[in-house]
């Protein structure tokens, strides 16, 4: 209102009257809400849990090691913000097949699953832009829980909609990397210190992603 008046325009044409502004400021009239959308939409902390399990052992003839790790991290968005999951698997086997022949096998893989909200505009920053564009003069909820308030003038409906993957759309991305290697080593007994080694390796990375937007 003040910017409107200072720009030389009449006070009568301002979007809000002084009385309306005071009602929004007081926060005592349900018809004049003042919603803190950042506080309503965003968590103060991001829940996550991680679990690791390892196993190792063996004999003089064979040694082994195995590792499994799991991470689950929720989004900063309180409602329908999605989550990130990661699986780590690693194993190693060293074996002495014969007196002068040994083998080594290594394997590792990382699997990542990302499940987040999405809408077809402005890419990764759309949710953050929507938070700042969602106006505080709209309520975060309505008396009828089956209805959703429209809280934005930029055509998105508000960040409480676009930040919720159950209401706006989904962006699901799955990544997997695989590394595997194996080797054989043969010690030539006739020539001390001489050995021959064969080595094979695999390095693979893949990504699968799906986008879906509700009409």
Which residues are covered by each model-predicted region?
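Short N-terminal secondary-structure initiator segments
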Residues: 1-21, 88-111, 151-181
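Extracellular loop and loop/strand-boundary signature of outer-membrane beta-barrel proteins
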Residues: 38-40, 74-79, 90-92, 165-170, ...
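Membrane-spanning beta-strand positions in outer-membrane beta-barrel proteins
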Residues: 52, 63-67, 96, 100-106, ...
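Outer-membrane beta-barrel domain signature
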Residues: 68-70, 75-76, 81-82, 89-90, ...
């Amino acid at each position: 209102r003040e910017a409107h008046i200072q720009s030389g325009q009449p006070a009568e044409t301002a979007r809000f009257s002084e009385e309306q502004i005071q009602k929004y400021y007081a926060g005592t009239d349900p018809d004049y809400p003042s919603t803190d959308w950042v506080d309503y939409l965003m968590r103060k902390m991001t829940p996550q849990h991680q679990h690791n399990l390892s196993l190792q052992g063996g004999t003089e003839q064979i040694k082994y090691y195995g590792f499994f790790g799991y991470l689950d991290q929720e989004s900063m968005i309180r409602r329908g913000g999605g989550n990130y999951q990661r699986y780590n698997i690693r194993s190693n086997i060293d074996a002495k097949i014969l007196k002068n022949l040994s083998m080594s096998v290594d394997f590792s893989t990382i699997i990542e699953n990302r499940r987040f909200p999405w809408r077809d505009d402005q890419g990764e920053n759309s949710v953050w832009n929507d938070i700042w564009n969602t106006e505080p003069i709209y309520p975060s909820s309505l008396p009828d829980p089956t209805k959703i308030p429209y809280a934005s003038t930029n055509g998105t409906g508000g960040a409480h909609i676009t930040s919720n993957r159950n209401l706006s759309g989904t962006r699901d991305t799955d990544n997997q990397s695989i590394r595997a290697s194996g080797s054989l080593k043969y010690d030539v007994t006739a020539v001390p210190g001489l050995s021959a080694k064969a080595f094979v390796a695999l390095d693979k990375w893949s990504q699968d992603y799906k986008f879906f937007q509700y009409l």
